[in-house]
């Protein structure tokens, strides 16, 4: 009986020890994360809404004032991206001073951040923020291209503490098809512990 009681006590203490760091990390970041999200087709917004709820974060949707709808809108957006051009956005200067932790969320266009998010980075200073870049795309970027997307944030003074990405398409019978939304959300939510850890572990 004593042995059983000791075993229960040890298990209880172990559970407390191993769950404390994660709980402490969530407590430290709760309400202190701002998601700046741009979404053209709705995929990035879908993932950001899931992150907002899971992280207890604030969210501001960045609007590209240039019409990006339809094939023509997609083409002009791609050209803007290839030539690193900025665009008109709203809000141009979101309040990033009130949140120390920023998530910049963007679809990938030609492996780069969308013009609206690149414009946010160019027109704001992130020297008082820890920044995570979160991207959605048809494929997963390699480390070299991740570093290229981090570079403008670093140039603006931000400390990039993480880069996370979720694929919104998959190959089926040699053809790219949209992944089920529930799978996209599931993959997004799997990132939450690592996002909390990234914001909490960096000085």
What do the predicted segments below correspond to?
Residues 12-15, 19-34, 38-64, 78, ...:
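FMN-binding flavodoxin-like domain, especially the glycine-rich phosphate-binding loop
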Residues 62-74:
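Acidic helix-start/capping segments at beta-turn-to-alpha-helix junctions
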Residues 1-10:
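Bacterial N-terminal signal peptides that target proteins for export
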